[in-house]
């Protein structure tokens, strides 16, 4: 069985393949594996809406079951932002580095005890027959004042999960997968994928 994962993000694709591989025996294709796949605008107001937009489009275009996620960082001191704008927080041409620096600038004067944040993920499955399944995952933690670690991507170098002394960028891939928002969402989605594809 083949499944398309509606992302071009190589780091995310690898992370999601690692998480799904032991649970659901399917060949996972990314959008980069498909010819001339267009960009799909993420116009939703929530992570779930954006994930459904991407998965519905991928299922319709490929005729394959499609999985998509939308995830981001919700910072308490920024009223839950950058949220669904996490990947493009620093504007046109946003990069992980620019986004991370902007968040650090925006919370620079926030005291340590008020630097709470959460990584949030909505993961969805959409089949060509119209079956839709949704799973959510969240990991809470604290924003550091400076980046630490070189693993992971995005805001990982400034996010320390609750109960941890390390950032998610200081963890191995297996350690991060075990606690991450995406790991939680996709482990919850995996049995739904298995039953929908049975």
Describe the predicted segments one by one.
Residues 1-4, 10-198:
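Anionic-ligand binding patches
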């Amino acid at each position: 069985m083949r499944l398309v994962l509606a992302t071009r993000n190589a780091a995310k694709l690898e992370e999601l393949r690692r998480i799904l591989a032991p649970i659901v025996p399917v060949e996972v294709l990314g959008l980069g594996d498909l010819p001339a796949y267009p960009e799909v605008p993420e116009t939703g107001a929530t992570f779930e809406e954006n994930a459904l937009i991407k998965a519905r489009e991928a299922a319709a275009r490929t005729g394959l079951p499609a999985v998509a996620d939308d995830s981001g960082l919700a910072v308490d001191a920024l009223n839950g932002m950058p949220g669904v704008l996490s990947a493009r927080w620093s504007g046109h041409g946003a990069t992980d580095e620019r986004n991370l620096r902007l968040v650090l600038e925006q919370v620079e004067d926030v005291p340590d005890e008020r630097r709470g944040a959460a990584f949030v993920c909505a993961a969805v499955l959409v089949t060509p027959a119209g079956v839709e399944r949704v799973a959510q995952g969240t990991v809470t933690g604290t924003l550091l004042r400076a980046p630490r670690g070189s693993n992971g991507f995005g805001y990982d170098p400034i996010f320390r999960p609750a109960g941890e002394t390390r950032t998610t960028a200081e963890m191995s891939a297996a350690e991060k997968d075990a606690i991450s928002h995406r790991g939680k969402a996709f482990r919850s989605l995996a049995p739904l994928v298995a039953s929908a594809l049975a």
